Amino acid sequence: MSRKESRSQAFQALFQLEMENTDLSIDEAINFIKDDYPDLEFDFIYWLVSGVKDHEPVLDEKIQNNLKDWKISRLLKTDRIILRMAAFELANSDTPPKVIINEAVELAKQYSDDDHYRFINGVLSNLN
């Protein structure tokens, strides 16, 4: 399956890990995906999910520095996760920034509120 679908599933795993009162581990969150999508790039998904969780405070600070008149804690959970994923990938992969930002915008169109993809695009363009 495509890297795009792998990013979507990584988003869903991170969303599950963000739920309050959950004791899920990263491995458990990813294992839920394996049953339904055995052809995904699980090395990439694990790298992305664990990287975001391991570096969350640093990613949040980097994102916060690029928010105008907003606090990261006030963002929708979906937007925070998408921004963290893209910020981590921008800093730690060889994938062209344009591709990473475009994929984040597509995730926002799929999972966030109507026009939030524009906000995601603006923040990530400033990070890059």
UniProtKB/Swiss-Prot annotation:
| InterPro entries in the cross-refs | NusB-like_sf, NusB_fam, NusB_RsmB_TIM44
- Provide the alphabetized UniProt keywords: RNA-binding, Transcription, Transcription antitermination, Transcription regulation
Example GO molecular function: RNA binding
Q: Name one GO cellular component term.
A: cytosol
Q: Does the keyword Ribonucleoprotein apply?
A: no
Give the GO terms filed under biological process for this record. Answer: DNA-templated transcription termination; transcription antitermination
The answer to whether UniProt assigns keyword Oxidoreductase to this entry is no
- As recorded in UniProt, coiled-coil segments are none
- PANTHER family from the UniProt entry: ANTITERMINATION NUSB DOMAIN-CONTAINING PROTEIN, N UTILIZATION SUBSTANCE PROTEIN B-RELATED
**Family (UniProt):** Belongs to the NusB family.
Q: What does this protein do?
A: Involved in transcription antitermination. Required for transcription of ribosomal RNA (rRNA) genes. Binds specifically to the boxA antiterminator sequence of the ribosomal RNA (rrn) operons.
Q: What is this protein called?
A: Transcription antitermination protein NusB
Q: Which organism is it from?
A: Staphylococcus carnosus (strain TM300)
